[in-house]
Amino acid sequence: MSFFHKLSVWIRSNFFIPDARALWIKPSVKHLLKYLEENPVDAIFSDGPPHSNTRIATLIKQKTGIPWLADFQDPWTQVDYYQLLRLTSFGDRKHRRMEFEAFTAADKTTIVSPTWKGDLELLGAKNVSVIPWGYDPEDFKKLEPVSRPDQL
């Protein structure tokens, strides 16, 4: 890795927390709070990464109390590349604080792996379910082949 690549990773990791979309958070929360005043909803759903989505949902949940389902396609601080982010102790603490706030605010949390489910629960996530990636072959057994005359 070049010096400039290492520097860019360090800047991104320590100044744009939780991720490169961090600048979306404040304006998104402001817009969504105004939107929700005029358009009430029964629940909030967020999907991350990017964890800026999770942070936005955390703040909306904290300010409104609307039930929230937090979906994680990958863990936050437990993801395998987290140690490669070259975080300062301040950056690491901020990531972990945001992660903990999300886990304790969410009414329901989903993740794609049973192993990660245990990791999230150890970090404070409650009411965690696993929704694995993939498909169920049983869903496709009764399908008939389709001819595609437009293909070779």
Where are these regions (language model features)?
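Acidic anion/phosphate-binding donor-loop and adjacent secondary structure
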Residues: 135-149
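Short His-centered aromatic/hydrophobic patch
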Residues: 47-51
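Membrane-proximal helix-turn-helix segments that form the acceptor-binding/catalytic region
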Residues: 19, 52-55, 59-63, 76-77, ...
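Carbohydrate-associated surface elements
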Residues: 115, 133-134
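Conserved nucleotide-sugar donor-binding subdomain of glycosyltransferases
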Residues: 1-43, 92-96
